[in-house]
Amino acid sequence: NVEIIDGGPVSFAKNRGAELVTTPYILFIDSDVRFFNVNTIRDAVDELESNNLDLVGLYVKCYDDDIRAQLGFMLFNAVNNIMKYKVPFAIGAFMLTRKEQFDKLGGFPEKFGTSEDFFLSKKYDVKKFKLVKHYFGQDNRRFQQMGYFGMAWYLIKNFWYRNNENYWKNLDYSKYWSAK
């Protein structure tokens, strides 16, 4: 069933959609995501069920010919693959979770303009999280908008200040969301 709900900031819209879910799992997929394998969703659900996980994510890959963006995503995947043992992070473009756990954790935090996926993911138990060995595809638009160094610096600062509420309150989100 498809139902159109009122929009708003990303966290708000995702939480309103999650309120409508009547199944044991919620799968958040951004509209511009592409898959490289037809079994990606099935394999993610299988991992969640067979390993009794609460949260499953994928690796990200650039689907256009931008070598710098491809390298940027590869570096991000490498860092996320190392950090997954300490801080779970399922990128919001593909995030599969148990509804019960999503509700228990309070859903996506609605007070920040970006990184809602990180703030929710880090609440999950690392033992109940897995990155499945599949990729979802993204284009290079964020790199184009913010510049390659700008995007890398943005991610580094966000990670560094991840526990600093004042940083997030004063962050200029327009650079991330604006169209070039």
State what each model feature region is.
Residues 5-21:
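Glycine-rich, basic loop-to-helix element that forms the pyrophosphate-binding segment
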Residues 22-23, 91-105:
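Conserved nucleotide-sugar donor-binding
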Residues 26:
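Short aromatic/hydrophobic "clamp" motif used to bind/position activated sugar donors
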Residues 38-68:
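Conserved donor NDP-sugar-binding/catalytic core segment of glycosyltransferases
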Residues 60-67, 78-97:
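A recurrent flexible, glycine/aromatic-enriched loop bordering the glycosyltransferase active site
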Residues 113-120:
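Acidic donor-binding loop at a coil-to-helix junction in glycosyltransferase catalytic cores
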Residues 121-137:
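Catalytic donor-sugar/metal-binding loop of nucleotide-sugar-dependent glycosyltransferases
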Residues 132-148:
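Active-site donor/metal-binding and catalytic loop motifs
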